[in-house]
């Protein structure tokens, strides 16, 4: 890859216009063939490949020629045939060609991304999952509307080719890409008119398609969002910084008070903030309801005009932050804004100000959690614990471990929220449901189960000390964490109720638009 990058730096116009010769570089397919042998691009067992097999570059050239002839399609997106000894070598060549095609297409994309990020240092720092939590803490208090937008992941192959055409001017290099995309669309795994861009299969080709598609979506949208903000110099802080204070004071209105002090309210122009995790994104907006409707309309119109793609209206949902349950990336919680009063002194008490802003205060949504537990058959609609009948065929240890895992995940999930006392009601429901499940399995009562297994068995699984077993904190830090918020970056992977809750919300929104 370094050689290809040097090739692009020597002559940028040549790199953009003549990518097709890179398809015939032997080193390129040697690298891709090594990736395939390492098992990074195929799930087939490697014992069927003999170490004495020679990799023929002439065969690769023939396959490249077959790609351009759509009547002679090669197998790129299906596994080996029932006879792996006869067809696995053919699959290795197909995987190598697909890997080589991806390596070539990554050259202009990586160079363009590098130059774009170098020119936007502030954008580079917000490309990590760890930026989600500062976004919640810093941007939500200054917003009153939240838009939950889902990136369209089903797109026609020709639209993808046209987006590549804006970056790659070499038309011959786009012919193999077009053929590969159409072949994937017509494969038995994807019998539909459009293709799924979301990388459900962890291959280099699908990851590249998804990254490029998201990059194109956000590169234009991000510039539009920046243009919509007229006060970019004013940072969202509890009080304005002293640096360039003469510029920031233009956005502040001073009210007189009886005690001759001055109270400052941070009054800003409409502000739009954007964050994305996976295929879902959140747009936090400070403005009126009309501004939110316009932002939603422009977002749908942008996708329709730029990508020639009709996006369903329910894929961009807006609601008021203080009245609804917010579905942040990986989190769903209720938010309460508490007024925060801060008094500052500047320049030897020549400027005394009282700053009033909002403090982000997430609340544990007990009622939605109870609804999810009822949906998963841990309790009824009134919150009364019931036995989990589908788990009665498991062993006692498996049942205890599953209930214990759900409780610990829920507790860690909402460790960044205040008002966690309601979580112990959830703990009571889960522990009693666990006892009823064991009693149903052994065809006895809860009292008999506790007597036979011992009360310490439930205390071990649902003990309060285990709430912090996954955190590398001391006892003092564990006690302090009861008063402080702790955000976990691996929450989207460990909470089993996020996807279920999100599906319920999506169905409700779709039903509203269908009416």
Swiss-Prot record:
One of its GO terms (cellular component) is chloroplast. One of its GO terms (biological process) is RNA splicing. InterPro entries: Domain_X (IPR024937), Maturase_MatK (IPR002866), Maturase_MatK_N (IPR024942). The keyword Cell division does not apply. It comes from Pinus koraiensis. HAMAP family: MatK. Keywords: Chloroplast, mRNA processing, Plastid, RNA-binding, tRNA processing. The gene is matK. This is Maturase K. Belongs to the intron maturase 2 family. MatK subfamily. GO terms for molecular function: RNA binding. Signal peptide: none annotated. The lineage of its organism: Eukaryota, Viridiplantae, Streptophyta, Embryophyta, Tracheophyta. Its main location: plastid. It is found in: Plastid, Chloroplast. Usually encoded in the trnK tRNA gene intron. Probably assists in splicing its own and other chloroplast group II introns.
